[in-house]
Amino acid sequence: MFKGLDASNGGGGNKRFLSVCQDLLELPIVSVDVGADGGVREWGELAALCEIHAFEPRPDSFDDLQKAQNEGGRPKVKLHNTGLARATGQHRLYITRIPQASSLLKPKPASFLLKRWRQDNGFDVAQELEINCISLARFVQEQQLSRIDFLKLDTQGSELDILRGGGDFLREISIIKCEVEFVQLYEGQPLFDEVVGTLASYGFRFFAFEEGAEVYKKRIWSDCMFIQSKFTDQARLMRAAVILIHIGYYEEALWLLVDHDVPVEIYQRLANARLEDITPTRIKLWQGFRGSVRKLLKTAGVLQVAKKFLKSAG
C-alpha cells in the first residue's frame, strides 16, 4: 500500500486525476463532515467534484468556518450550524475548557482523567448550551440525498448515536471515517468494539486506523476507517474507489475494484493519474537528472572500454 501519499503531499495539483474522475464517475461525490472544527481538510482540488456538507454546532467554531468560507481559498461547503444526534430536537452541548473536547455527552469527572492521562483541566465543563440537533435520517431526507459517499464523524463520543440515527440509510453510505475511543472519556460513551459491531450489522468492514493518541503504549482514541463490503451499484463503487485513492489507500482501492470484477486497467488509470499529480516537481526533476547521469555514466563506461581496446590493439 502507498499509504501516506495523501491530499496534502501535492506538487502539481490534481489536474490529471480530476480529468480521469470526470470521465469515469457519476458526480457529485457526496461528503458529510460532522464535527468540522478547523475546516474540511480531506478534499483539496477534488472538492470541485464534490457536494460537501459540514456540521459545527459550537458558535465560535462555526463563525470561523463562515469567515474562512467568505475569504475564499477553501472548497465551497454547505455549512450547518446545528448538531447531529440520534433524535431530532434540543440537546445539551457540554463545552469544555479545551473547546475541541466539547460533546453531547458529559465528560467524566476531571479526577478520572487527571489520575490517568491528562495533566490539565481541559475536559472540565466551562459552559452548557442547548442546541438544535437533527438526526442523520431526517437530514438526508431534507437535503434529498439518496447516498453519502464519504461520512466523517468527530463528535467526541456521540458518533455511534449519530450513526444509529441514520437507521437503514447507513446502507447507502460507502465510506466512514469515525473517531472512536478505547477508554470512556465521557459518561455512557460507546467504545471501539461496539462501533465496529454496529457498523458490521449494516455491511461495513473496518480496514484501517488513522491518527490517534497513545499514552504509555495505551491507545486512547483513533480515527477508524470503514467501507461497505459489497456494492451493487457500479457508480457508487467507482466513487468509493476514487475516494480511497485520493486519501492514500491504493491497495484497498485495487482490491475493491478487483473483487467487484472491474478491469484492473481502470484502477491503473486512476492510480497513475493520482500518483502523477502528487509527485512533487523536485522529485520529477531529480528522477530526470538521475536518469541523465546514468546515461552519461553508461556512455563514459563504453568509452573507457573502447579506449582500452584501442590501446591494446595498437
Label for each model-derived stretch:
Residues M1-G314:
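Phosphate/nucleotide-binding beta-alpha loop and adjacent structural elements of enzyme active sites
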